[in-house]
């Protein structure tokens, strides 16, 4: 009897822990959750639910835009409960946003957002323009949940490449792992980083980039300061460069890179000040 109760308790603990991630992917036309969306057209941004596959952990939700941008966007959360499958990224569409609800305060604009991916051709940024179709995937893993977006037939350096962006969320961590790959194994130069707006604090250190402050264009009645950060292996990238709206890093020639991203905000309980967010990286 004791052994049975112990086994049941262990199963319950596993279920609770595993419930701290979620994923979502669907066409707007039917709102049915699916594991994969395949499109012969490169840009179906406005036809896919929340504009692309989305994944959530206890501290944030992320989505990959289903278009040429390669951008990753952020949904900020005040509490550790799951919200993605209930609100589908937009709590205000279900009524007034409650005290415990998160919201879409992050503004990507025309950038790659937080840890999104583009390519670099030695002189300029190359967006993931899919000439041979685009695929999105979402599902569960042993440790949590994942989403993926694949752009097929991206014109690059006098040829074509197929680029995958995958985000893995582990139920035991507040960070998410971003993996970018060229599917045939061809070496390319990946571009990633963290976007920023006028008035935000920007800081860098050994293997990390951080940004703190409200986002220009956030329509909230009271601006919500956000934290956005990226960790990376310095030996894989050139030094951090600052443009007018992006703290970017460019990889050395490689068929695959991995980074970790994190987001926070003043509405959460842990990393809710700029000082705490900065200290997290030290």
Q: Where in this protein do the model-derived segments appear?
A:
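Bacterial Sec-dependent N-terminal signal peptides
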Residues: 1-21
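Solvent-exposed N-terminal domain segments of exported/luminal and surface proteins
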Residues: 21-128
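A short, structured loop/turn motif at beta-sheet edges
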Residues: 137-143, 171-172, 182-189, 251-256
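Acidic (Asp/Glu-rich), glycine- and aromatic
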Residues: 163, 175-205
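Aromatic sugar-binding interfaces of carbohydrate-active proteins
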Residues: 195, 201-221
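Beta-strand-rich recognition/accessory modules
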Residues: 226-282
